[in-house]
């Protein structure tokens, strides 16, 4: 059984990690442990680079907290221009896999709040009256009327980030390129 450390305490992100690992390695093949670690970036990362750095930093911090684990996973949501998205970083002792989620265009009034220094989750809580929105379906769930959620979008991106760990065609071609 794989010991997977989720570098987050957010239930929506933990569920996405659990689903992606189950889909990849099988039901009951992974034990997910949540740890609270710093991202090393701002509370609301702006731009692709800062957001990806946050996901990678979460993995580095989780590795220090639980060095005995088989996998470490960082998920960091960010804003670039008028879009929200997230980076997924998955590592084991030998390999890193990464993927960026789908993006969602945000309304101008929310972007104004973000430009004023507020987090997307806070802005969504204000307009919905739900203080837990970022720990549930997120902006994605609200704006797609529940057709998608943070969990479902992150689940897809995590499946892509896990490709280097299980797909023999990918592994053979990746190893050949490194030689």
From Swiss-Prot:
The keyword Hydrolase applies. GO terms for biological process: nucleotide metabolic process; thiamine metabolic process. Keywords: Hydrolase, Magnesium, Manganese, Metal-binding, Nucleotide metabolism, Nucleotide-binding. Its EC number is 3.6.1.73. Signal peptide: none annotated. Binds 1 divalent metal cation per subunit; can use either Mg(2+) or Mn(2+). Substrate binds at residues 8-13, 68-69. This is Inosine/xanthosine triphosphatase. Homodimer. It comes from the Bacteria. HAMAP family: Non_canon_purine_NTPase_YjjX. GO terms for molecular function: ITPase activity; metal ion binding; nucleotide binding; ribonucleoside triphosphate phosphatase activity. InterPro entries: ITPase-like_fam, Non_canon_purine_NTPase, NTPase/PRRC1, YjjX_NTPase. The keyword Manganese applies. It catalyses: XTP + H2O = XDP + phosphate + H(+); ITP + H2O = IDP + phosphate + H(+). Phosphatase that hydrolyzes non-canonical purine nucleotides such as XTP and ITP to their respective diphosphate derivatives. Probably excludes non-canonical purines from DNA/RNA precursor pool, thus preventing their incorporation into DNA/RNA and avoiding chromosomal lesions. Its cofactor is Mg(2+); Mn(2+). Mg(2+) binds at residue 68. It comes from Serratia proteamaculans (strain 568). Belongs to the YjjX NTPase family.
């Amino acid at each position: 059984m794989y010991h997977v450390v989720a570098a987050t305490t957010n239930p929506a992100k933990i569920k996405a990690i659990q689903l992606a690992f189950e889909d990849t390695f099988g039901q009951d093949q992974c034990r997910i442990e949540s740890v609270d670690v710093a991202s090393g970036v701002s509370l609301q990362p702006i731009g692709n680079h800062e957001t990806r750095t946050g996901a990678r930093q979460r993995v580095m911090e989780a590795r220090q907290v639980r060095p005995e684990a088989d996998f470490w996973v960082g998920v960091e949501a960010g804003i670039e221009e008028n879009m929200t998205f997230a980076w997924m970083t998955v590592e084991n002792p030998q390999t890193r896999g990464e993927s960026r989620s789908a993006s969602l265009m945000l309304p101008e009034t929310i972007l104004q709040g973000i430009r004023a220094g507020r987090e997307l989750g806070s802005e969504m809580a204000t307009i919905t009256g739900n203080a837990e929105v970022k720990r549930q379906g997120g902006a994605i769930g609200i704006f797609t009327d529940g057709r998608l959620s943070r969990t479902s979008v992150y689940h897809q991106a995590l499946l892509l980030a896990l490709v280097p760990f299980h797909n023999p065609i990918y592994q053979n071609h990746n190893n050949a390129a490194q030689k």
